[in-house]
Amino acid sequence: MALPDFTMRQLLEAGVHFGHQTHRWNPKMKPYIFGDRNNVHIIDLAQTVPMLSRALQVVSDTVASGGRVLFVGTKRQASEIIADAAKRSAQYYVNARWLGGMMTNWKTISNSIQRLRKLDEILASEASGFTKKERLNLEREREKLNRALGGIRDMGGTPDLMFIIDTNKESIAIDEAKRLGIPVVAVIDSNCDPDQIDYAIPGNDDASRAIALYCDLIARAAIDGIARQQGASGRDLGASEEVPVEPALEEASEA
């Protein structure tokens, strides 16, 4: 395997170059702005290309060394895409509301994850002896916990890298990552603060096609890292019970 390829044309077709209206910009983004068109900032894709390539390398290297990547995107148009990409690449995700202390208070989060596992056991048991109302309340509790924590229930600890869509919306997640020294890969739109991000990707963070492109590339970089890790350990990937789905095969099955 190798790092996923992408082209300037793909970025253009996905609308990665469209920033926000000029009056909404963050002046710190000036180095990444190509110009403006109809009062909308145009992001300099000549900078996005190498910065995205660098981010993909960081993701692959993190996973290849046994690290965990947490995908974060809770806005409506990112939620499902974030979850799908993380699952496809055997990583972790938060796609509902970010709970304060999710990283900095991991012990409390771990207790909630244990409660979620316990509810799974209870509700899977036929001989639980609960009334219909009690069972319904337990199912609601499980659904609420699963929505918040389902994507990190098997993470086993804080991640080694975070990938974030919309740094303004996910500012609490970024603050927690900074406090714990967790590096952050993130898309920075024209209204964002690039100083907070270790591996910034200048680009639109609102268009669903752009979000889908970033997430697909990051997922494929993680899969590349898995292959490198297994190759380095001498493990026979073809003999594994579960193997990552190659993007080319996935596309062929959908065609």
From Swiss-Prot:
GO molecular function, one term: structural constituent of ribosome
Keywords, alphabetical: Ribonucleoprotein, Ribosomal protein
Region (Disordered): 232-255
GO biological process, one term: translation
Record-level GO cellular component terms: cytosolic small ribosomal subunit
Domain of life per record: Bacteria
Record flagged with keyword Ribosomal protein: yes
Keyword Ribosomal protein recorded: yes
Family: Belongs to the universal ribosomal protein uS2 family.
PANTHER family given in the database record: 30S RIBOSOMAL PROTEIN S2 PROKARYOTIC AND ORGANELLAR, SMALL RIBOSOMAL SUBUNIT PROTEIN US2M
Protein name: Small ribosomal subunit protein uS2
Lineage: Bacteria, Pseudomonadati, Pseudomonadota, Alphaproteobacteria, Hyphomicrobiales
